[in-house]
Amino acid sequence: MQVSGILSALFLVLLAVIVSPFQFVQPKRILPIPTSRDQLLRGQLAYLKGTTVAQPAVNDNTLGIFEASAMAKRLRGEPIRFGKRSPREPIRFGKRFNPLPDYDFQ
């Protein structure tokens, strides 16, 4: 009688140890597939900022033409020039944008 009680208690402890890590796993959100160019860029911006929601609640933060082209250049690793470049300043290739580290959203 005591052996079966000890074995059932050990079985319950083993089951709790196996199951406990999985109760904290959050299901991945399925975001809609971006259809337009500015939705795609907004999703990339959300990835670089480290936010989880790519679509803003109020659409007052849309990217303009300059911001979208600068963002696309930055993602491709191309240099972004503002105005005319002085001849003494060389174009530095290979300067790629380092994205933010993956945050642990708890």
Curated annotation (Swiss-Prot):
The keyword Ion transport does not apply. Residues 82-106 are annotated as: Disordered. GO terms for biological process: G protein-coupled receptor signaling pathway; locomotion; mitochondrial unfolded protein response; positive regulation of protein secretion; signal transduction; sleep. The keyword Signal applies. Transmembrane segments: none annotated. Disruption phenotype: Knockouts generated by CRISPR-Cas9-mediated gene editing strongly inhibited the peripheral induction of the mitochondrial unfolded protein response. Residues 1-27 form the signal peptide. Keywords: Signal. Residues 82-92 have a biased composition (Basic and acidic residues). FMRFamide-like neuropeptides. Involved in mediating arousal from the sleep-like state called lethargus, which occurs during molting between larval and adult stages, in part by regulating touch sensitivity, and working in concert with neuropeptide pdf-1. Involved in neural modulation of systemic mitochondrial unfolded protein response. This is FMRFamide-like neuropeptides 2.
